[in-house]
Amino acid sequence: MRLSQHSGAPRPYSSGATLVQKIGVVLGEGVGPSIIEQAMIVLRAAIDTSGVPIEIEFAPDRIWSNRQQLELNDDFGQFYSRCFADQIPILHGPAGGRFVYELRAMFELDVKFTPIAPHPDIADASLLRPERLRAADVMLIRDNSGGLYQGDFGWRENGSVAYQEALYRRQQVQRVVSVALETAAQRDNRLTVVTKPGGLPTISAMWKETAEQLNVSGVELSFMEVDNACFQLGSAPQQFDVIVSPNMFGDVLGDTAAIALGSRGMSYSANFSRSGAAVYQTAHGAAHDLAGRNVANPVGQLLTLCWLLRHSLQRGDLASSIEQAIAQVLRGGYRTADIAGPDSSVVSTSDLGARIAAAVSAQPAPVR
C-alpha cells in the first residue's frame, strides 16, 4: 500500500513509541461501532499471526445526548486522561457534534495530520485522471486550537442574533506552522499556507507573517486562498506537498481532498498534543444515515489503525501486514459500494473486514 512518504508527526507533536503495547479504543457514533469492530477483527488476526501481545482497552459504554451524539462526560474524560498519562494511543471511531472539538481543546490536541495518498488499487473509483492520482502525496496539517471551531458562540437579543468568535493567538499559529515547516523539510520541502485575506484579513495576515518569520530552513513557501485550494485539491492534488491551514479551512480541505481517494471512507487522520497524546481517527464523519446497515467502508478505519501501530507502538511490521492485506483484497475486486468500480464485487462492511482479516491470517509471521 502506498502511504504518504513521511506519514509520521514530527516532534514535539509525535506520540513517540509507547513503552506499553496497549491501545485505547473509542467506538464513536453512527457507523463508528461497525467499522471499529472490523478494525478489532483485523488487529486480532495480526496479533494471532505475529504473536505480538497488544492489550486493548475500550472506553466506557457510550452515553448519548438527546441528539444521539457522544458527550464528553466524566467517564470519557477519565478514560482519555488515563490513556494520555500512560502514553497510550487511542484508536477513535468517528464522532460528530461538539464532542471532537471539546476533546481537542480539553487535552490540547493542537495539531491534526491528514495524509492524502490515493490507493493505486482503486484508481477507477476516483473522479481524477490516473496520472494525477499516481503523483498525489499530500499531508494536510490543520490547527485544532483556535478559529471559529474553538471560539465563543451563542445567541443575543432574544435569539435574533447568532454569533461565533474566530480568534487566533500568535502562539497558536506559531505552533502549527512550526510543525508544518518541519514536516515539509522532511518531505519535498514545499509548504502551502491556506488562508482567505479578503474575508479574514487580520487572521490571514497573522498566518502569512508567522510562516515567513519562522521559515529559516529554506522551505519553499506559497500562499493560496481557501476556495482556490479546494478547487486545486479536487482537480490537481499532485501539485501540493504539505498544506497548513486554520481550523475550519483544514476541515473543508480534508473533505475536499477525499475526492482523490475515491471516497471519504478511505480517509484517515491523527491528532497530537505537545505532551505526546495521540488520537487516531478516520477523517470522515459519523454517517448516521449508514449506521446499522452494514454498508460503511471500514478501510479508512483500518488505515487509521495502521498509522497508530506504526507510529505510536513502533510496530511497522504489523501495519505493513494489514496494509498488504487491504491491497490484496481490493486488488481482488472486493469493495464496499462507495469505492466500487465497474467490475467490482460489492460486499458489506463485515464481509470486507473478514476478507482482510483472512488475508492477514494467511500471511507468514511478520519480521520486525
Predicted regions and their residues:
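Extreme N-terminal starter segment of soluble prokaryotic enzymes
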Residues: 18-24
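Glycine-rich phosphate/nucleotide-binding loop
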Residues: 117, 234-334
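N-terminal glycine-rich phosphate/adenylate-binding segment common to multiple enzyme folds
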Residues: 67-163, 248
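Buried hydrophobic positions in well-ordered alpha/beta secondary-structure cores of metabolic enzymes
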Residues: 29-32, 88, 141, 180, ...
